[in-house]
Amino acid sequence: MKRWKGAALLLLCTVVLLRLLQGLAQPEKENAHVPVLGIVTTAAEDDRREAQSEALVHAAEEHGFKVLEMPVERTQEAQIEAVRALIVYQVEAIAFTPLVESGWDNVLREAKSASVPLLSIDRAIRGVDDVPLQHIGFDYASLAEQAADALLQQRMPRDGVLELYGTVNASDAREIARGCREALEEQGLTVTYSLCGDGMRSRGCEILEEMEDHLDEIGYIFAQNDAMALGAVDYLHSHGRKPGKDVLVCAFGGGAELRALQKKGEVAVIGALDDTQLAELTADAAQQIAKAPWKPYIALADTAVLTEEGTADA
């Protein structure tokens, strides 16, 4: 199966590359070089992730890049295979959102050896000593602390806290958890239950089903992405509970579907991420690291805490 997946990926890469080269064969100016940005697009778990990918492609094209997009499944193995394929094709730079933060040492060194810089987007990776960190993301811990504060201000802390944890070993999950806990500790609270939903809507629903006997203890739900929050709201609706009244929900992301629920009063607080700015910063960074590949590069996009009452910069 692994060999089949690898062969299928290489075939896909070859087809995409041939189409790309056909486009490059007819530039407006003879022999003009069009820089190529490789983007590893991982299967999206919600509309916010889909919009993020679209914004990244659009920003890259607006900055003069030809985009070579590699869609992959939600596994680190698939991401690494795609990165390696793009290294072989000698794109100017590669942008990707790593599912987890460890396990990238070998491919980082391979990229450096081939002079193809890797830019981690949204989530961070653990660097290696001889490869500089190049990352565009968000200050998740600060956002989480402020979002949790905003949630606790809406109702006096009196109930338990359920955390719908994202992907284990992912930087965003760790930092959101840290920020939320810091805010809770200031109020003398702790996370009552923390269960891993791997960022999936179906798991958000399943976790609440597993917790049915304990839901009366829960007053707050912290969902680390849109998808799990949507799954939790789905379950609450289908079992006669009222999100926004019986349980206050805080989620991190801010896609269209989640914002629609907030307008209906069913999601109390959103830790919103500016994916448009993230995409612009990524395209800017890709231009710069293509010229100076092995210099450290870190930039953070804006975030905001959204409540029904208004918006506060995080």
Model-flagged regions — what are they?
Residues L68-Q90, Y193-L215, A229-G231:
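Structural motif
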